[in-house]
């Protein structure tokens, strides 16, 4: 196929994006709508999600949903809402994650904050993926799932509730990719780093540690997300972790050479 061909097939595909009210989730959801894909925008904030829908290239293709995905009942309601609005979800993006506070280090994070982070990220990602896959398998329909993890799924962040939740998601991607692959459902991870969006507070001084010399924006993730989600572009890619970090993960205590 030509790389200039459309990434998606709007006649056969429909999407569900969590965390679609801001940051990376919003950018990916809007990019899907920009490809003419009917997309459910799910977020915990009604104000944010309605603003994201309104700002989309084709708001008539964007379906809002408001609810806290830490709740199993809300997750079930989201699945029913998506099925009612779209018929069948073929593309799933799990970007929802509670806010991070630098104060929540290992000696300070509360039991409630820990549970909320894991419930939204790991439990939400697992249960939504499993139920969406169940529908696709029954219908013998291929699908593509993308879970947002983090560089800190493998390196400490001083936020143990966040890092452990993302580490769990990284392994979840591999487990689901292996289980669902024979049914034509691909599951991959998108690994952002130093993206000025969502819970990350951008510190301009960080840019000097990034080989590409700048902080990333949520929009830097959207083209890669579309490519990985696309069954036309990435038909043979599953269980992969795609890093989009401007080279931040290459950083160590050595400075680059003067050339």
Residue ranges and their predicted role:
Residues 107-126, 146, 169, 211-212:
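Catalytic Tyr-X3-Lys loop
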Residues 218-244, 249:
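C-terminal substrate-recognition "lid" of short-chain dehydrogenase/reductases
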Residues 98, 144-168, 173-182:
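Catalytic loop of short-chain dehydrogenase/reductase
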């Amino acid at each position: 196929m030509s790389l200039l061909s459309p990434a998606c097939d709007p006649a056969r595909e429909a999407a569900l994006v969590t965390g679609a009210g801001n940051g990376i989730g919003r950018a990916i959801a809007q990019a899907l709508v920009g490809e003419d894909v009917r997309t459910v925008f799910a977020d915990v904030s009604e104000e944010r999600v309605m603003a994201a829908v309104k700002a989309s290239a084709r708001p008539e293709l964007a379906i809002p949903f408001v609810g806290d995905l830490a709740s199993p009942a809300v997750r079930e309601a989201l699945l029913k809402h998506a099925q009612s609005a779209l018929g069948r979800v073929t593309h799933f993006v799990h970007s929802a994650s509670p806010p991070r506070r630098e104060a929540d280090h290992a000696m300070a994070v509360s039991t409630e904050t820990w549970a909320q982070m894991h419930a939204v990220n790991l439990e939400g990602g697992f249960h939504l993926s499993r139920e969406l896959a169940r529908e696709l398998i029954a219908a013998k329909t291929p699908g593509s799932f993308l879970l947002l993890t983090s560089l800190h799924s493998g390196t400490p962040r001083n936020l143990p509730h966040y890092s452990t939740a993302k580490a769990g998601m990284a392994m979840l991607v591999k487990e689901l990719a292996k289980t669902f692959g024979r049914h034509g459902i691909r599951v991959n991870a998108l690994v952002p780093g130093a993206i000025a969006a969502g819970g990350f507070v951008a510190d301009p001084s960080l840019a000097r540690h990034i080989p590409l010399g700048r902080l990333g924006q949520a929009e830097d993730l959207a083209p890669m997300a579309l490519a990985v989600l696309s069954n036309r572009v990435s038909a043979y890619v599953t269980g992969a972790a795609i890093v989009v970090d401007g080279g931040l993960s290459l950083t160590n205590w050595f400075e680059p050479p003067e050339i």
